[in-house]
Amino acid sequence: MKQPFGKRLTMLVAAVCLALTATPAEARDVSLADAIAEALAANTGLRVTAQGEKTAEAELREAKGQNNWSASTSASASTDKQKEEDRSTSGSVGLTFNYPLYTGGKNEANIRSSEYGVDIAGLTTERARETLKYDVIKAYFDALESRHTIEVNQDSVNYYDANLTNVQQLYSAGSKARIDVLRASVELSDARQTLIKSENAYQVNLATLRNLMNIDRTEPLNLTDDFAYDTFDIDLASCVDYATRNRKDILADQYTLQQKEEAVKVAEAGWKPTVNFSAGPSLSKTFEPSMRNESTYDMKAGVSASWDIFDSGVTRAQVDRAKADRDTAQLNLQKAQEDADLSVRTAYYNMREAEHRLDSTQDAVGQAEQDAYIAREKYRAGEGIMLDVIDAQRALSTARLNHISAQYDYARYKAQVIDEMGVGLTDAERTAAAKLAGLPIETAPTQTITEPAGGAADEETKDTAKHAEQQAAVDATVNALSDNSEELASDVADELAGNGE
């Protein structure tokens, strides 16, 4: 006996969802604190940022070396032959020590600028840690929200599946029209599609979390923490004030401004003289002619000074450029403060909006559950229509999803407010972050692209073929429906005219 279209579609979509929702065994339990700690200890992007500290420290050593002793050696050899004279051959070797006595303040300014650079690099790394912490929190809550969304969508699928069975039974008994069966089948199909999309979103969010934690990209995870409402009692003005005074990127911009001030001093040093001290021994020896074979040893010390009194305006141009860079840094600092003010306010307003939604959406869920129950019972009693049942179920799903959204919006925006304020890491998080420096830097392997010889199964894309088979089954169902379209149209017309069986 040929099964009804709705029943066949239900079985097909159920098989699809069963394949997609299968979860691997032995998933690792991960709390939010664990996720943050692992990310701080292993995130590659954070490691890249931390390398800037080593660069800044090397630049500081270089600047200090420019203002200290240096030594150089020299050697020469020459031969000379003039007409009617014997050939003359001689050589010399020398060692010279140099020390900059006065550079017009250039070397000292470069040292101070490099010291600011070390501070900037440290603040940049610290800010990157705080941002990474927020990114992990967001990814964690995104995954949790997706997981609860799956639960709601699965409940909808279960309801529409049961509803389809009920409608088919009523249709077989002659108390409902066939158009109700078709409508119930379509709603079940739509619910299945929504479920599949939410399951995919969950996997994408887990992949994002694994990437931030820098763990095995295929490792199954079980997120053990969940939303718990916790009040945020700090007023907006205090949040903005804290951000202005404590944001690491704003502090880094302040140091950058100081660097540009030192750059002006470096440029202005071009108008001043330089004084250098040099001293060292030298040895010279004459080899030919043999009658003049002699050696000379000297020790010299002296002070030299130089002063560029005219350079066609080159120094003036360098000073003007340095001052323009300083003014730009001042504007960048002002803009960073304004951006921080806006970002804190935006996150704060969004957090409060989500907080207000928590209570209202909770009430809406209870009301929607009652409405859905009434609609189902009225339909079973023959006093309601299918549209009322569908609308009530949709309203219930929407209310539940809105409540879930409000919960995790509040959690995410609260974390964003804390991040935008520039609140530092906890002691435990700093301990985890300290492990980052000890990781070795591995050389990325070079891969050669070759055509596969054996065509082994791809674990990452193995479901693609399965989905293709499922799509083929759906296409077959649609084709079958198209073949029976004239019969279905006739049946629907009869039912609308009151002649349905």
Language-model features: where?
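Membrane-embedded beta-strand positions in outer-membrane beta-barrel channels/transporters
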Residues: 94-96, 140, 276, 302-304, ...
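Amphipathic alpha-helical coiled-coil segments
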Residues: 48-63, 128, 132-152, 162, ...
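Acidic, low-complexity, intrinsically disordered peripheral segments
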Residues: 2-4, 26, 402-501
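Transmembrane beta-barrel architecture of outer-membrane proteins
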Residues: 90-92, 138, 183, 274, ...
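Gram-negative bacterial Sec-dependent N-terminal signal peptides
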Residues: 1-26
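Small/polar (Gly/Ser/Thr/Ala-rich) solvent-exposed segments
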Residues: 47, 70-88, 98-129, 251, ...
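Periplasmic alpha-helical coiled-coil/stalk elements that build and connect Gram-negative outer-membrane
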Residues: 2-3, 8, 129-242, 347-350, ...
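Regulatory alphaC helix of protein kinase catalytic domains
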Residues: 28-36
